[in-house]
Swiss-Prot record:
Induction: Expressed late in the infection cycle.
Function description: May participate in nuclear egress of viral particles. Plays a role in the dispersal of several host nucleolar proteins including NCL/nucleolin and NPM1. Since deletion of host NCL/nucleolin negatively impact on nuclear egress, UL24 supposedly acts on this process through its effect on host nucleoli.
Major place of residence: virion
Listed name of the protein: Protein UL24 homolog
Entry similarity comment: Belongs to the herpesviridae UL24 family.
Organism: Human herpesvirus 6B (strain Z29)
Segments of skewed composition (Basic residues): 237-252
Length: 252
């Protein structure tokens, strides 16, 4: 099954929950332990003191990975100067597992789409390889979150790719290739305003408003019809009603 066959509303709900995940990552960026726990403990312990940079929805050629977490290692024994994690997030209504990925057609389609996204995004960096630059460890990760409560059901961390890249150039590339609309949403400090803005961004707010308006209109039109019926009965000629009643009585 292709994800293009999903109802439009399901895609919009998925986009909305992606934004919630991004906001949570930003709130945990300064706390390595909590950020690592939220993402499935994918970062090794020796990166606990590393500086962390986060990028969202970075356009890399034909692909846009959901999130890139870049950690600058301060461990003298670490062969890599930088550890770069490419994340692809999938959200589901029910619980997802590796078994459901094999048997649930939607979960399977999400998983395969995520793999293609990660592979092509990381391969895009190959055009920027520089022989005498520092070593990077580029790691692809796919995470399945339950939409209710943003619970991480399961994740898959794949083997890292070793690349020699320029830190300043790649950081600049990531920063300027982010989605501007997403950055504006994530900059909203108040959570209630953020949630409402996300609903508007994904068109969910408009749908909810239209649904509510339709309900109100239906109720109002029903009330108007009832009022009109009562008014007709009220305005009916009373003499005519009485004469009709007398005729019926004589016939009996």
């Amino acid at each position: 099954m292709s994800l293009t066959g999903l109802p439009d509303i399901r895609k919009k709900i998925g986009q909305f929950h992606h934004l919630r995940i991004y906001k949570q990552i930003l709130s945990l960026q300064g706390n390595f332990a909590r950020l690592n726990y939220f993402l499935g403990d994918v970062f090794p312990a020796n990166l606990r003191s590393a500086s962390v940079s986060v990028f969202f929805e970075v356009r890399l050629g034909p692909r846009i990975p959901d999130c890139i977490v870049l950690l600058k290692s301060v461990d003298a024994k670490d062969e890599f100067a930088f550890h770069c994690y490419f994340f692809e997030f999938k959200t589901t209504l029910g619980k997802s597992t590796m078994q459901s990925v094999h048997h649930n057609c939607i979960h399977q389609a999400q998983y395969l789409q995520g793999l293609r996204q990660l592979h092509q995004s990381i391969s895009f960096l190959d055009q920027y390889l520089i022989a005498d630059e520092v070593l990077w460890n580029v790691v692809p990760v796919i995470c399945f979150f339950r939409q209710w409560g943003l619970k991480l059901d399961f994740f898959k961390k794949f083997s890292g790719k070793t690349k020699r890249l320029s830190f300043s150039f790649i950081c600049d590339l990531f920063a300027r290739s982010q989605d501007g609309a997403v950055q504006s949403l994530l900059s909203i400090p108040n959570y209630t305003n953020f949630r409402r803005a996300c609903q508007k961004h994904t068109d969910l707010y408009r749908r909810r408003y239209q649904k509510a308006s339709k309900s109100v209109l239906t109720k109002t039109s029903g009330e108007n019809r009832s009022r009109a019926s009562r008014q007709v009965a009220k305005n009916a000629p009373k003499n005519r009603i009485r004469r009709t009643a007398k005729k019926d009585a004589k016939r009996q």
